[in-house]
């Protein structure tokens, strides 16, 4: 017999659902160990907890309900057209507030949302470092949403279409807000090309979503910008791929198991979701739901 119980085994022992176990962990009411991203429960300590001492301690230590322990039904962070569509079509009841990945992280820290869309570039990948530094001891989980192709979106009537980032010099460049993950990606690409922001010719106005950036280019307010293939295709614009990024969802663990988010997850396993991703273009959804980091 193992000295440790898994979450499923403990839920069966307590005759509760697994999400109730996560609630008790989040409240600090259960003896738990975190090993390689998994929660394990020491059998002897659990038996003592069941014996009564743990129950009394749980009643004393359980925190009062607060906005942070029950975040509002909002998904914040980076914008994604496929995610925006899925939230509507799934009828999950989750509201969207897309104002950039960094803005979403700040809102999560303040307990203002149940999930955050992230595409923060890091030396060894995407998003994990940004999450680990802020939420190491809090009950959040980072799951993959999709991989997206990002590159230069430009007008089809440009005399000399860009073949690399350096070719945008002299063209009116459409920027995003500083909190947007795409601005972090742009900084990395500029560094790789040994370029600086001063080498760009930014238009005065910024755009706050992927589709708004493409709209600005299609209406002639800008010549080029860094965006995703799906947005370029929506507005019949030309596209030069530069990299593939991983867009993840950072989810409050309890909310992950609640009906609204589970409704979204169920919808995303249906054929209509895959068909929409294919129609939009530039998406790889084969890794949807993969856990990339488990906090707490």
Where are these regions (language model features)?
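Periplasmic-binding protein-like
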Residues: 142-151, 233, 237-266, 287-293
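N-terminal hydrophobic or amphipathic helices and topogenic motifs
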Residues: 1-103, 112, 135-140, 160, ...
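Flexible hinge/capping segments at coil-to-helix
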Residues: 145, 154-173
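Short helix-initiation/N-cap motifs at beta->coil->alpha
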Residues: 97-106, 198-215
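A ligand-binding cleft/hinge motif common to bilobed small-molecule-binding domains
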Residues: 120-133, 214-243
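Ligand-binding cleft/hinge of the Venus flytrap
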Residues: 85-91, 176-178, 182-205
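Short loop->beta-strand "edge-of-pocket" segments that line small-molecule binding or catalytic clefts
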Residues: 68-78, 165-184
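Short beta-strand-centered segments that line the small-molecule binding cleft or hinge
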Residues: 104-149
């Amino acid at each position: 017999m193992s000295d440790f119980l898994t979450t499923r085994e403990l839920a069966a022992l307590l005759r509760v659902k697994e999400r109730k176990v996560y609630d008790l962990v989040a409240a600090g009411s259960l003896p738990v160990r975190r090993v390689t991203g998994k929660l394990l429960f020491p059998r002897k300590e659990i038996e003592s907890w069941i014996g009564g001492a743990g129950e009394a301690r749980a009643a004393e230590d359980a925190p009062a309900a607060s906005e942070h322990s029950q975040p509002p039904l909002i998904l914040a962070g980076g914008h994604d057209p496929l995610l925006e569509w899925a939230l509507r079509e799934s009828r999950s009841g989750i509201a969207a507030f897309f104002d950039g990945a960094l803005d979403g992280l700040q809102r999560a820290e303040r307990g203002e949302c149940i999930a955050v869309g992230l595409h923060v570039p890091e030396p060894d990948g995407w998003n994990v470092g940004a999450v680990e530094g802020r939420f190491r001891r809090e009950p959040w989980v980072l799951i993959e949403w999709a991989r997206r192709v990002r590159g230069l979106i430009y007008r089809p009537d440009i005399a000399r279409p860009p073949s690399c980032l350096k070719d945008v010099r002299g063209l009116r460049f459409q920027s995003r807000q500083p909190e947007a993950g795409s601005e972090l990606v742009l900084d990395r690409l500029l560094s790789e090309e040994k370029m600086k922001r001063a080498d760009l010719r930014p238009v005065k106005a910024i755009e706050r979503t992927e589709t708004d950036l493409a709209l600005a280019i299609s209406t002639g307010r800008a010549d080029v910008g860094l965006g995703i293939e799906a947005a370029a295709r929506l507005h019949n614009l030309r596209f030069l791929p530069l990299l593939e990024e991983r867009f993840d969802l950072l989810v409050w663990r309890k909310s992950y198991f609640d009906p609204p988010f589970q409704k979204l997850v169920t919808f995303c396993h249906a054929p209509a979701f895959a068909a929409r991703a294919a129609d939009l273009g530039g998406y790889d959804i084969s890794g949807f739901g993969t856990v990339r980091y488990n906090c707490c």
